[in-house]
């Protein structure tokens, strides 16, 4: 299904004939490529494909980049090389995400991985080793007091709450209201 074109004049004639008679070429599925010698080639993808493969996308991008680099000094009107590309419409029906028939954006996107956020606790931080450290500000000595290293963030938060309960008379804040506090 390759049709070579020797010049831009032949290409323009072929495009005009295809626009006037759509049975000759379904221009929603064909891609035109040019080579170094200004020969244009009409490439039709496999009829069962509903979107471009990575190789087809790569070829289109490389061809477009060559076109831009080779015509960097020339204006678009005087350029004899043409690259016309069109992506075939997806034939799977309406998009399940946006509900639009023939949607290009949703069908080509990769699913995003959801990032699970860890709950933040006051006075608790994660160490590079993966363990959790707890420390609290001691108002008497005006320094941080080390409470220890724990396997889970909840265990470190409980340690912080216990230490904050000691300073409660001095308005110590805790992580959550439902956690049991010690009075001394």
UniProtKB/Swiss-Prot annotation:
It is found in: Nucleus. Disulfide bonds: none annotated. The keyword RNA-binding does not apply. GO terms for cellular component: nucleus. InterPro entries: AP2/ERF_dom, AP2/ERF_dom_sf, AP2/ERF_ERF_subfamily, DNA-bd_dom_sf. Its main location: nucleus. SMART domains: AP2. Gene3D superfamilies: AP2/ERF domain (3.30.730.10). Residues 120-177 bind DNA. Keywords: Activator, DNA-binding, Ethylene signaling pathway, Nucleus, Transcription, Transcription regulation. GO terms for molecular function: DNA binding; DNA-binding transcription factor activity. The keyword Transcription regulation applies. It comes from the Eukaryota. GO terms for biological process: ethylene-activated signaling pathway. Probably acts as a transcriptional activator. Binds to the GCC-box pathogenesis-related promoter element. May be involved in the regulation of gene expression by stress factors and by components of stress signal transduction pathways. Belongs to the AP2/ERF transcription factor family. ERF subfamily. This is Ethylene-responsive transcription factor ERF122.
């Amino acid at each position: 299904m390759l049709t070579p074109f020797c010049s831009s004049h032949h290409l323009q004639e072929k495009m005009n004939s295809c626009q006037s008679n759509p049975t000759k070429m379904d221009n929603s599925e064909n891609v035109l490529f040019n080579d170094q010698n200004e020969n244009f080639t009409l490439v039709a993808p496999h009829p069962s494909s509903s979107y471009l493969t990575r190789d087809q996308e790569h070829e289109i991008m490389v061809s477009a980049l060559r076109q831009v680099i080779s015509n960097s000094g020339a204006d678009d009107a005087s350029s004899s090389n043409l690259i016309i590309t069109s992506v075939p419409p997806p034939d799977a029906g309406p998009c399940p995400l946006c509900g639009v028939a023939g949607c290009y954006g949703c069908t080509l996107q990769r699913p995003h991985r959801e990032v699970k956020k860890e709950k933040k606790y006051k006075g608790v931080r994660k160490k590079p080793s993966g363990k959790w450290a707890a420390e609290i500000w001691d108002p008497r000595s005006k320094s941080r007091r080390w409470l220890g290293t724990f396997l889970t963030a909840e265990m470190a938060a409980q340690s912080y709450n216990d230490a904050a309960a000691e300073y409660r008379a001095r308005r110590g804040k805790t992580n959550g209201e439902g956690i049991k506090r010690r009075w001394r």
